[in-house]
From Swiss-Prot:
Function as written in the Swiss-Prot or TrEMBL entry: Scaffolding protein involved in the icosahedric procapsid assembly. Coassembles with the capsid proteins to form the procapsid. The scaffolding protein is found within the capsid as a serie of concentric shells. During DNA packaging, the scaffolding protein molecules are released from the procapsid.
Descriptive protein name: Capsid assembly scaffolding protein
Gene name for this UniProt entry: 7
Segments of this protein annotated with the region Disordered: 1-24
Record bears the keyword Kinase: no
Keyword field contains Membrane: no
Family assignment from sequence similarity: Belongs to the phi29likevirus scaffolding protein family.
Keyword field: Coiled coil, Late protein, Viral capsid assembly, Viral release from host cell
Subunit composition and interactions: Homodimer. Interacts non-specifically with DNA; probably binds DNA in the early stages of DNA packaging.
Protein source organism: Bacillus phage B103 (Bacteriophage B103)
Coiled coil: 79-99
């Protein structure tokens, strides 16, 4: 995990001190180098995670599109079947007319 912004600023401010000993300066620079490495590592991990999520999102969009099209086709067929059933039903009036004949 990278260091906090305040810690980073504090180290940079210490490095600006002309009276800072060489050993302390070296130690502070090593801390910054280590932090930079962790920042790059975390950035790389987050970038790959983002790419993976984008790919999964694209796959889900395609799957949802196919599913919606399939559901639409199924509903259209169900409506056609219902209309055919309704056209084949006999109403009470039709039965009365047939009984009077």
């Amino acid at each position: 995990m990278p260091m906090e912004r305040d810690s980073h600023e504090e180290i940079l401010n210490k490095l600006n001190d002309p009276e800072l000993e060489h050993s302390e300066r070296t130690e502070l620079l090593q801390q910054l180098r280590a932090d930079y490495g962790s920042v790059l590592s975390e950035f790389s991990e987050l970038t790959s995670a983002t790419e993976k999520l984008r790919a999964e999102n694209s796959d889900l969009i395609v799957s949802n599109s196919k599913l919606f099209r399939q559901v639409g086709i199924t509903k259209e067929k169900e409506e056609e079947i219902k209309q055919e059933e309704l056209s084949e039903t006999i109403t009470i009036e039709d039965l009365e007319k047939q009984a009077q004949l």
